[in-house]
A protein has these predicted regions:
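Short, well-ordered beta-to-alpha junction loops that form the rim of enzyme active sites
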Residues: 180-182
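Short, conserved phosphate-binding/catalytic loop or strand-edge motifs used
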Residues: 172-176
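Active-site cofactor/substrate anionic-group-binding motifs, chiefly glycine-
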Residues: 77
């Protein structure tokens, strides 16, 4: 029987493999409120390389958390942002694959392949009524060719990666996500429909898809953009997915995936409204927010924990250019707002926590400070055992913050009636 992901799934990241139990505790709390959300632990190849962790460690930590909390529902391990070059080491430990074809978006496929694909979907040419979208979609052969030129090559690559994994691990043994979010502008409903048709033609049993949304999804901070426009795009995407599932025989549980979804408080209510209205499912990835709760918990514990949290910031500040470079498109740091490390050295635990904890209404909250630390996990990785020992020493404080952050600020506003 094929592996089918549940309606609501929640991507969690545990960079240093110490917070699995605390993360799962938040999911358990949601279950106690009658909301079934399943955890998906995800860690990219880049994160493994930065930290120096073994790929198997993600599965080991997830399984240990599940055993410790006696969790008897599903859980998954996501090989996040994989491509053909790096997939092999993930094959033994993953049952969810986020196929990243960003590099192929915008690269035209062969003209003959584009024409053959467009010829295979004549039903999309003309005026198309999609239930849930106010206006009919107007599509011409020319507009479909244009979309195919931009995305078909990427979908073909996704098909190649999917078939490689299926050949190695067996069909139906894993969840497939196709990531289309790393492109310049959001896909329009006609574009998303063409992409989904192409995915169906490739025979990819896609269960989650990550389109590009309007606005900025910066790391660890709130959504920046037009919330009303986001809500319209989100609802339109849900409508297109429902239509494509029926039209092209895609998996019935196909749902949207929101990347960099942690801390996007402004859009949680619009997402919840849309899910309630349509009955749709959701996958949301919240990887990096937990590492910041480790720093908050360490600082809150005071003493050595606070000293170490200050040291992490001082190192991140000194190496900010190198740390920020790989994340340049998904951070927005005002260097004038970054406090001098000497100033931070004199802070109390409360001052450090207030600057870092994501409470946008708190007068001491510092978005730039938070974003720099978000991308600065490499500084903690370089500390090696010293950092890991601090996680153990400050476990009570850290666990409490990790669970509270995921439950109160993420799961509750997204899935639980207030």
């Amino acid at each position: 029987m094929a592996l089918i992901i549940e309606k609501f799934s929640f991507g969690v990241g545990d960079r240093f493999a110490h917070q699995g139990k605390a993360q799962l505790a938040a999911i358990v709390k949601a279950a106690e409120q009658g909301v079934e959300v399943v955890p998906v632990w995800n860690k990219s190849n880049r994160e493994h390389q930065t930290i120096g962790s073994e790929i198997a460690s993600c599965r080991q930590a997830a399984d240990a958390a599940v055993k410790a909390l006696d969790w008897n529902k599903s859980h998954y391990v996501d090989a996040y942002h994989i491509n053909l070059k790096i997939v092999d080491p993930f094959l033994d430990n993953s049952d969810f694959y986020t196929i990243d074809v960003a590099d192929a978006i915008g690269t035209p496929a062969e003209e003959s392949e584009v024409n053959a694909f467009v010829d295979s979907i004549p039903e999309l040419i003309g005026s198309l009524d999609i239930p849930g979208i106010d206006q009919p979609l107007e599509m011409t052969r020319e507009s479909i060719v244009k979309t195919a030129n931009h995305y078909l090559k990427a979908v073909q690559l996704a098909g190649e990666i999917y078939r490689y994994i299926a050949d190695k691990n067996g069909e139906g043994t894993f969840i497939t996500e196709v990531s289309m979010d790393e492109t310049d502008s959001p896909q329009t409903p006609p574009e998303l429909l063409v992409i989904l048709a192409a995915i169906a033609k490739q025979g990819i049993p896609v269960q989650t898809i990550a389109p590009k949304f309007t606005g900025r999804f910066n790391k660890g901070v709130d959504y920046v953009g037009d919330v009303a426009q986001f809500e319209k795009e989100f609802q339109d995407d849900l409508a297109v997915i429902a239509f494509a599932v029926k039209k092209y025989g895609l998996p019935e549980n196909l749902k949207l995936s929101v990347h960099s979804g942690s801390d996007k408080f402004s859009i949680y209510e619009p997402i919840r409204r849309a899910l309630k209205k349509t009955g749709a499912g959701l996958h949301i990835k919240t990887a990096g927010t937990t590492w910041l709760e480790e720093l908050i918990g360490s600082a809150e514990a005071g003493g050595d924990g606070l000293d170490l949290a200050k040291e992490v910031y001082a190192e991140a500040f000194a190496n900010s250019e190198a740390l920020c470079a790989p994340y340049a498109t998904v951070i927005d740091i005002n260097t004038d707002d970054l406090p001098d490390p000497e100033t931070v050295k004199a802070w109390t635990a409360e001052q450090y926590v207030n600057a870092l904890r994501h409470d946008p209404n708190h007068p001491e909250f510092n978005s730039s400070f938070r974003q720099l630390l978000h991308v600065g996990y490499k500084t903690a990785a370089k500390m090696g055992d010293r950092y890991l020992k601090m996680l153990v020493k400050c476990e009570e404080s850290i666990s409490r913050n990790v669970t509270e952050n995921l439950y109160e600020r993420h799961l509750k506003p997204l899935f639980i009636d207030q």
